[in-house]
C-alpha cells in the first residue's frame, strides 16, 4: 500500500488490522497505539483536523500525529483510543450498564466550552449542506431508517429536504459530537474513554446528539446490525439525561441525518 513519506515513516513495518465498522467510505487501519484514516472527503478531513485540534485537552478524543493530502487522498494518523466501541456485545447485552455511561458521555459533551469553537453547525449550516447533497444526488436512499421513503414516508430526498426546511424547530445551542452513534463512542473500565469521527462536531442543537444516540440504541436493540436485544429499554436514556423527550425534535434530527 502506498503511503506518503511523512505517514510511512511513522508506521512502516508495523502490524495493523482493518476496521470495517462505519459507513464513511474511508479505510481505517488500526495499529497497536495509532489509527490511520484514508479517505477522499477533503471537507471532512479539514473539519476533523480543526475539531481535533480544538478539542485537545477539552474532551477525550484522538490526537493528530500527522495529516496530509496527496494524489486525491486524505491521510490522518491519530492516537488510538483505548477500550471498545459502545456497540460491542458486552455493552449492548447490558442496558443497565451502557445507558448511564452514554448519558454521562452526552453530558460530558455538553460541558465543553464552546468559546472559539471553529464549527457552528446550527440549522442554517446543516440545511445548506443537506440541500447541496440533494442537488448533487449524494443521498443514500437505501441505508435509512424504515419508513423514511416509500408509501408511509417521503417520496424522495428532495421532498424530505423541503419538509425539513419548512419545519425547522427552535434551537438550543450546546457542544455536539455531530454523529453520536455507538461505534463512535469508546468505553474502558466502565466509563467513556473517547469519542471518534468528530468531523461534524461543533455547536448545534441539543437534540442532534440525543436523536442519533437514541436511533443507534434502537437499531441495536432491534437487531439491525446483528443480534436483537428485545428487552433493551432505549427510552431509559431520557430519564438519565433528566429530560422529557421531545419526540418531534427526535424525529426531525433523525430525518435530517438521512441527508448526510
State each model region's role.
Residues 50-54, 101-108, 129, 159, ...:
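Alpha-helical elements of Rossmann-like donor-binding domains used by nucleotide-donor carbohydrate transfer enzymes
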Residues 170-176, 188-245:
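Active-site Asp-x-Gly
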Residues 2-8, 111-178, 246:
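An alpha-helical support segment within catalytic cores of ATP-dependent transferases
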Residues 10-19:
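Conserved N-terminal boundary motif of the eukaryotic protein kinase catalytic domain
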Residues 153-154, 239-252:
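Short, surface-exposed acidic
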Residues 18-122:
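ATP-binding pocket architecture of kinase catalytic cores
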Residues 183-187:
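Hydrophobic residue at the +6 position relative to the catalytic HRD Asp in the kinase catalytic loop
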Residues 252-259:
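C-terminal accessory extensions appended to soluble enzyme cores
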Amino acid at each position: 500500500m502506498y503511503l506518503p513519506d511523512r505517514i510511512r515513516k511513522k508506521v512502516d513495518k508495523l502490524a495493523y488490522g482493518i476496521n470495517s465498522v462505519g459507513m464513511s467510505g474511508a479505510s481505517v487501519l488500526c495499529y497497536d497505539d495509532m489509527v490511520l484514516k484514508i479517505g477522499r472527503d477533503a471537507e471532512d478531513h479539514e473539519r476533523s483536523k480543526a475539531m481535533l485540534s480544538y478539542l485537545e485537552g477539552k474532551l477525550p478524543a484522538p490526537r493528530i500525529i500527522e495529516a496530509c493530502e496527496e494524489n486525491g487522498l486524505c491521510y490522518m494518523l491519530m492516537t488510538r483510543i483505548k477500550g471498545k466501541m459502545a456497540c460491542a456485545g458486552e455493552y449492548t447485552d447490558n442496558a443497565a450498564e451502557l445507558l448511564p455511561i452514554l448519558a454521562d458521555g452526552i453530558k460530558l459533551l455538553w460541558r465543553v466550552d464552546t468559546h472559539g469553537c471553529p464549527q457552528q453547525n446550527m440549522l442554517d449550516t446543516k440545511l445548506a449542506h443537506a440541500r447541496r447533497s440533494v442537488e448533487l444526488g449524494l443521498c443514500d436512499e437505501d441505508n435509512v431508517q424504515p419508513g423514511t421513503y416509500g408509501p408511509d414516508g417521503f417520496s424522495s430526498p428532495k421532498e424530505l429536504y423541503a419538509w425539513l426546511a419548512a419545519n425547522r424547530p427552535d434551537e438550543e445551542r450546546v457542544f455536539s459530537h455531530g454523529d453520536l452513534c455507538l461505534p463512535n463512542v469508546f468505553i474502558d473500565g466502565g466509563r467513556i474513554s473517547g469519542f471518534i469521527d468528530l468531523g461534524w462536531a461543533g455547536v448545534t442543537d441539543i437534540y442532534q446528539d440525543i436523536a442519533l444516540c437514541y436511533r443507534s440504541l434502537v437499531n441495536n436493540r432491534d437487531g439491525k446490525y446483528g443480534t436483537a436485544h428485545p428487552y433493551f429499554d432505549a427510552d431509559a436514556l431520557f430519564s438519565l439525561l433528566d429530560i422529557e423527550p421531545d419526540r418531534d425534535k427526535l424525529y426531525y434530527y433523525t430525518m435530517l441525518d438521512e441527508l448526510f
